[in-house]
């Protein structure tokens, strides 16, 4: 009996111990995982309305971080744009590539617009905005690859513009991914707080999405235009320079210098040195001299492209008459072309010819001014001063552009649009044979090129102060001078005849002043004007007239 009671007591003791082990142990709230606590709270609270602010993806920490990054990119691109804008006025180391134009500014603006579009109503993602962003980044990636593989374009764009293309490409891709991540965060919040993904859109959201997609379409169109212009420029590289690209200014950039005939040997005839006009390249202007060369009347001649014109690279600011003339003198020294020279200058090229002659008097045989500019045209208001008659600047239309503030403002606007290449691309699309590579590089479409417009802007910035003072100090007295003027310009403009008369009196040895009849500003385009122009040049260089 004693044994039985002992066993019974042991069993009851074991039962009590096992029941104590099976009982739940109290758990502190701090020991429960945060996700489980949050899930429990969500189960206890009622589902929220989809429009409730608490459903916003910005309540998620990772989305708020993306918002901070996107906002930071706006300021980064804004600072980049300001630096690139300042580099158009001042030479900043590292920001002066050989083919410097307005492309860098446009790329910075595109990147800024992409970031602004993303930041505008950040919490409202748009699917088609994201798709367009992927297409934009793909186009820019193709641009980068093409520009990198085509050697002349790679050298022209330099590290700066190539980096900007890559930067905008990455910006577009990253902002599209931001839109995807925000949408994922939005769905996550909706499932957690409303129980389902909300597919309906409010009117305000639809309006926001519409403008976001519209903004992305505009960005894509801009990038497409830039891409097409870049691809056409790559195609145009098959058109080789006529002469040599000579490095100048400590090898910072190159100017195009092309000579025909024996310019290093001895001859009784001087080297005819050609200066083009404001909107006319030396290649286009020299055709009447080329004709004389083929007829063995002009033995040798040289043409060159000022920075930004034709085949030449862009120059760092500033670009005054004297500074550009120094580039020409350096190129001639490097090519060991010593003269003597007969300088022919058309339009504003007459001022460059005058500057070159004044700095190389011992090497100058003669100067021919072809409907040349007066220094007054370098001033903001060319009709100021004694003996000048006030007239509208519209009288210069289709002949030249004055250096006033309105023209300067228009040039800058044209500059910002120029990387899109709308008109040249349209010309190429409609008339590919008529508007060929030659037309874009040094022909009629040259005036739409971004580097040309930038050169004009640089020329305009210092024209009224630096260039004007330089040309007024230029002395060509006692040099043999010939002047030919358009009768059309003299009859049309109140001051043109007086300006041409003043040019004819720059030297005591002015041999002739010829009025080309039935000729507009571009004298060589009319048969009679071309004949008079050629005969005058032949007389200046000591040759017999060959046309009767």
Predicted regions mapped to residue ranges:
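Active-site loop/oxyanion-hole signature of alpha/beta-hydrolase fold enzymes
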Residues: 306-344
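Conserved HGGG/HGGXW glycine-rich cap/lid loop of the alpha/beta-hydrolase fold
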Residues: 262-311
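Intrinsically disordered, low-complexity terminal tails of fungal membrane proteins
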Residues: 1-61
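A short loop-to-beta-strand scaffold at the N-terminal edge of the catalytic core in hydrolase folds
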Residues: 245, 250-262
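Conserved hydrolase catalytic core segment
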Residues: 338-381
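Membrane-embedded alpha-helical segments of integral membrane proteins
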Residues: 128-194
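Post-His helix in hydrolase/transferase enzymes
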Residues: 519-520, 524-542
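Flexible "cap/lid" subdomain of the alpha/beta-hydrolase fold that forms the substrate-access gate
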Residues: 321, 325, 363-364, 368-511, ...
């Amino acid at each position: 009996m004693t044994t039985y009671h002992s066993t019974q007591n042991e069993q009851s003791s074991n039962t009590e111990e096992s029941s104590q082990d099976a009982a739940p142990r109290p758990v502190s709230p701090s020991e429960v995982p945060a996700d489980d606590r949050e899930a429990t709270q969500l189960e206890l609270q009622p589902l929220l309305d989809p429009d409730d602010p608490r459903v916003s993806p910005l309540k998620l920490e990772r989305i708020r971080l993306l918002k901070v990054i996107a906002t930071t990119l706006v300021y980064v691109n804004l600072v980049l744009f300001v630096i690139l804008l300042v580099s158009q006025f001042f030479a900043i180391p590292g920001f002066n590539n050989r083919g410097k134009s307005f492309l860098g500014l446009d790329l910075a603006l595109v990147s800024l617009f992409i970031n602004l579009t993303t930041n505008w109503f950040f919490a409202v993602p748009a699917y088609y905005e994201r798709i367009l962003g992927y297409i934009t980044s793909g186009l820019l990636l193709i641009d980068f690859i093409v520009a990198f593989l085509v050697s002349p374009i790679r050298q022209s764009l330099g590290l700066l513009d190539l980096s900007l293309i890559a930067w905008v490409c990455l910006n577009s891709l990253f902002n599209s991914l931001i839109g995807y991540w925000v949408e994922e965060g939005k769905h996550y919040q909706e499932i957690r707080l409303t129980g389902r993904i909300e597919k309906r859109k409010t009117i305000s959201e639809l309006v926001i999405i519409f403008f976001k997609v519209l903004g992305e379409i505009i960005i894509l169109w801009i990038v497409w235009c830039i891409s097409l212009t870049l691809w056409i420029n790559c195609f145009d590289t098959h058109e080789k320079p006529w002469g040599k690209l000579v490095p100048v200014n400590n090898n910072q950039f190159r100017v195009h210098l092309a000579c025909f005939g024996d310019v290093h040997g001895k001859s009784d005839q001087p080297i005819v040195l050609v200066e083009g006009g404001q909107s006319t390249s030396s290649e286009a202007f020299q055709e009447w001299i080329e004709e004389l060369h083929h007829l063995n009347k002009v033995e040798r001649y040289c043409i060159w492209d000022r920075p930004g014109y034709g085949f030449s690279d862009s120059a760092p600011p500033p670009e005054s008459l004297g500074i550009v003339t120094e580039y020409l003198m350096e190129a001639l020294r490097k090519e060991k072309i010593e003269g003597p020279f007969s300088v022919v200058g058309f339009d504003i090229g007459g001022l460059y010819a005058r500057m070159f002659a004044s700095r190389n008097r011992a090497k100058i045989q003669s100067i021919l001014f072809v409907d040349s500019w007066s220094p007054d045209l370098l001033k903001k208001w060319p009709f100021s001063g004694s003996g000048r008659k006030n007239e509208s600047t519209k009288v210069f239309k289709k002949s030249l552009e004055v250096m006033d503030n309105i023209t300067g403002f228009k040039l800058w606007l044209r500059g910002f649009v120029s990387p899109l290449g709308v008109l040249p691309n349209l010309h190429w699309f409609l008339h590919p044979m008529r508007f060929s590579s030659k037309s874009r590089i040094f022909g009629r479409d040259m005036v739409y090129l971004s580097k040309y417009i930038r050169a004009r802007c640089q020329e305009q910035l210092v024209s009224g102060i630096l260039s004007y003072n330089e040309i007024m100090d230029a002395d060509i007295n006692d040099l043999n001078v010939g002047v030919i003027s358009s009768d059309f310009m003299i009859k049309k403009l109140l001051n043109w005849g007086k300006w041409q008369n003043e040019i004819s009196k720059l030297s005591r040895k002015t041999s002739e002043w010829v009025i080309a009849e039935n000729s507009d500003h571009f004298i060589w385009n009319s048969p009679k004007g071309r004949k008079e122009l050629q005969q005058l040049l032949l007389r200046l260089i000591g040759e017999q007239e060959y046309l009767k």
